[in-house]
C-alpha cells in the first residue's frame, strides 16, 4: 500500500491491498480467540492468557473500527442493502430506512494522503495498524510457545522418571545417559560413550529404549525418522529425540 499504485484496468493495487489488510487484521483477533480457547482447554497458567488478553485490548484500542470495516467488506451483500448486523441493525431498529442505512455505511476506500482506510463512518490508520498487528502476532506466538515449553518440560520429567525407575542414571557428569534441558523446546537423549564400556553399550541402549517406551514416549532419529534400530543407533552415539507416542 505504501509502494507504487499499480492500475490494471479499473483496479488499483492499493485499494485491493487495503481490502486484504482489513480482512487480515480482523483475522488476527480470530487467531487470538482460538489461542485463548486452546489455553483454557490445555489448562495453561492463567497468566499466559491474561498477557494475551492485554495485547488484544491494545490492538483493539489502536483499531477500534476494524471489525466494522471488515464486516462491510465480507458481508457486502447485506451491508450494500442496509441489512447488515451490528451497527446497521442498530440503525434499522432506531427507525432508519434500510436504503439510508446502506448509504451511511458504504463507500470503502484507502486514502494515500491520510494513510487511512475507510468504510462508511468507520476508519483505521494503516500507520497504526502495522505496529498493533506486529505486537498481537508476537503475543500469540509467545502464548503458543508457553504451551510448547510446558509440554517440553513434561516430556523431560517423564523421561527422567522412567530412566530413574529403570535404574539408569542421567545425572551429569557420571551418568551414562544425558537428557537435554529442553532449551530448544525439544528433548534429546544420548549415551555417554566415554563412560560406558563398548561391550555394555547395546545392553544399556536397549534398557533405555524399553524404559522410554514403557513411559508412553518414543525415541526418534532425526537423521532417519523411520529407523527401527533405535537401540543400535543410540549405542553408536547418535543423539535421539524424545517424543510422545
Region annotations inferred by a language model:
Residues 2-15, 50-179, 187-188, 202, ...:
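Acidic, Ser/Thr/Gly/Pro-rich intrinsically disordered interaction regions
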Residues 5-50:
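Short, contiguous, well-structured surface segments enriched in hydrophobic/aromatic residues
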Residues 32-43, 73, 77-80, 219:
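Amphipathic alpha-helical interaction segments
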Residues 45-46, 52, 184, 197, ...:
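Intrinsically disordered, low-complexity coil/linker segments enriched for acidic/polar
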Residues 184-193:
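Short, aliphatic-rich beta-strand segments
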Residues 193-199:
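A short, exposed loop/beta-hairpin motif centered on an aromatic-Gly-Thr core
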Residues 210-244:
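A short amphipathic beta-strand at an alpha->beta junction
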Amino acid at each position: 500500500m505504501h509502494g507504487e499504485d499499480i492500475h490494471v484496468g479499473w483496479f488499483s493495487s492499493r485499494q485491493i491491498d487495503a481490502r486484504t489488510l482489513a480482512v487480515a487484521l480482523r483475522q488476527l483477533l480470530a487467531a487470538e480467540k482460538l489461542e485463548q480457547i486452546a489455553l483454557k482447554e490445555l489448562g495453561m497458567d492463567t497468566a499466559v492468557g491474561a498477557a494475551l488478553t492485554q495485547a488484544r485490548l491494545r490492538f483493539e484500542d489502536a483499531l477500534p473500527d476494524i471489525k466494522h470495516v471488515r464486516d462491510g467488506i465480507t458481508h457486502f451483500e447485506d451491508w450494500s442493502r442496509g441489512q447488515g448486523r451490528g451497527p446497521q441493525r442498530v440503525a434499522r431498529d432506531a427507525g432508519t430506512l434500510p436504503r439510508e442505512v446502506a448509504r451511511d455505511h458504504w463507500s470503502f476506500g484507502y486514502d494515500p494522503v491520510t494513510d487511512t482506510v475507510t468504510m462508511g463512518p468507520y476508519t483505521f490508520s494503516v500507520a497504526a495498524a502495522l505496529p498493533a498487528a506486529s505486537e498481537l502476532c508476537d503475543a500469540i506466538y509467545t502464548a503458543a510457545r508457553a504451551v510448547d515449553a510446558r509440554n517440553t518440560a513434561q516430556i523431560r520429567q517423564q523421561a527422567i522418571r522412567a530412566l530413574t525407575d529403570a535404574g539408569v542414571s542421567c545425572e551429569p557428569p557420571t551418568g551414562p545417559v544425558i537428557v537435554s534441558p529442553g532449551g530448544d523446546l525439544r528433548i534429546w537423549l544420548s549415551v555417554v560413550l566415554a563412560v560406558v564400556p563398548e561391550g555394555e553399550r547395546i545392553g544399556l541402549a536397549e534398557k533405555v529404549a524399553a524404559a522410554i517406551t514403557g513411559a508412553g514416549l518414543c525415541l526418534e532419529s532425526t537423521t532417519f525418522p523411520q529407523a527401527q534400530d533405535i537401540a543400535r543407533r543410540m549405542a553408536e552415539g547418535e543423539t535421539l529425540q524424545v517424543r510422545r507416542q
